[in-house]
């Protein structure tokens, strides 16, 4: 059945954020269990699921966290974001208000999460083409302006769901790998330590990627 769940080289925590009803839970279940529930109700509290993928011969275990987007769950934000190295910021392409709220979610993410977290903007429910309210080009331009990656998905018909999660996990892995190489070069040693200090390029203007500057000496 492939790699056992307890065997992995890296463990990355990725959080799903965005308004309630945009399809976060179904993105999670589609990627981790290949399931979709048309009757799914708003998530109560927090839940997470895991799935492992292979990147460059390494086993990457993703621990993906999902919480409801309603305001009353704001109290859990600190614990929810703690330790996250990636985030999927999800909106519904058929509901413009969920896209308008992306900016607020992005601010909350940057207030609570590590400043170097990798963020992907996800326009979900791309199967609802006839109801589209958010132009793809508009969302892509917003993502570029805010240094986010961007993709449109459909949890219902599986379009780009694998790609969304695998792309963000691969991006995190590349950054971690470069950080390890840079650290070893800087210290001129390779201390067999499995604890990875993750430093990713900044997602906000005006910040410098301090931890990666040692690469310039290579």
UniProtKB/Swiss-Prot annotation:
A motif (Switch 2) lies at residues 67-86. Residues 216-218 form a propeptide. Keywords: Acetylation, Citrullination, Cytoplasmic vesicle, Disease variant, Endosome, Glycoprotein, GTP-binding, Hydrolase, Intellectual disability, Lipoprotein, Membrane, Methylation, Nucleotide-binding, Prenylation, Protein transport, Synapse, Transport. Its EC number is 3.6.5.2. It holds the Pfam family Ras. It is found in: Recycling endosome membrane; Cytoplasmic vesicle, Secretory vesicle, Synaptic vesicle membrane; Cytoplasmic vesicle, Phagosome membrane; Cytoplasmic vesicle. GO terms for molecular function: cadherin binding; G protein activity; GDP binding; GTP binding; GTPase activity; myosin V binding. GTP binds at residues 20-21, 23-26, 37-38, 40, 42-43, 69, 124-125, 127, 155-156. Mg(2+) binds at residues 25, 43, 66. InterPro entries: P-loop_NTPase, Rab_GTPases_membrane_traffic, Small_GTP-bd, Small_GTPase. The keyword Transmembrane helix does not apply. Interacts with KCNMA1. Interacts with RAB11FIP1, RAB11FIP2, RAB11FIP3 and RAB11FIP4. May interact with TBC1D14. Interacts with ATP6V1E1. Interacts with PI4KB. Interacts (GDP-bound form) with ZFYVE27. Interacts (GDP-bound form) with KIF5A in a ZFYVE27-dependent manner. Interacts with RELCH. Interacts (in GTP-bound form) with TBC1D8B (via domain Rab-GAP TBC). Forms a complex containing RAB11B, ASAP1, Rabin8/RAB3IP, RAP11FIP3 and ARF4. Interacts with WDR44. Belongs to the small GTPase superfamily. Rab family. This is Ras-related protein Rab-11B. It comes from Homo sapiens.
């Amino acid at each position: 059945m492939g790699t056992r769940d307890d065997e992995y080289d890296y463990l990355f925590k990725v959080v799903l954020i965005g308004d309630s009803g945009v399809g976060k839970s179904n993105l999670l279940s589609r990627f981790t269990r290949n399931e979709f529930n048309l009757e799914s109700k708003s998530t109560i509290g927090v839940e997470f699921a895991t799935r492992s993928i292979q990147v460059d011969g390494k086993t990457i275990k993703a621990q993906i966290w999902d919480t409801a987007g309603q305001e009353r769950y704001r109290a859990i934000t600190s614990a929810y974001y703690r330790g996250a190295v990636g985030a999927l910021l999800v909106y519904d392409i058929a509901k413009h208000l969920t896209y308008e709220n992306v900016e607020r979610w992005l601010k909350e993410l940057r207030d609570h999460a590590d400043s170097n977290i990798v963020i992907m903007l996800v326009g979900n429910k791309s199967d609802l083409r006839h109801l589209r309210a958010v132009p793809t080009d508009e969302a892509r331009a917003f993502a570029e302006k805010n240094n986010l990656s961007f993709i449109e998905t459909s949890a219902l018909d599986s379009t780009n769901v694998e790609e969304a999660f695998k792309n963000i996990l691969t991006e995190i892995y590349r950054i971690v790998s470069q950080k390890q190489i840079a650290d070893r070069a800087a210290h001129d040693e390779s201390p067999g330590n499995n604890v990875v200090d993750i430093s990713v390029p900044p997602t906000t203007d005006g910040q410098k990627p301090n931890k990666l500057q040692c690469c310039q000496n290579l």
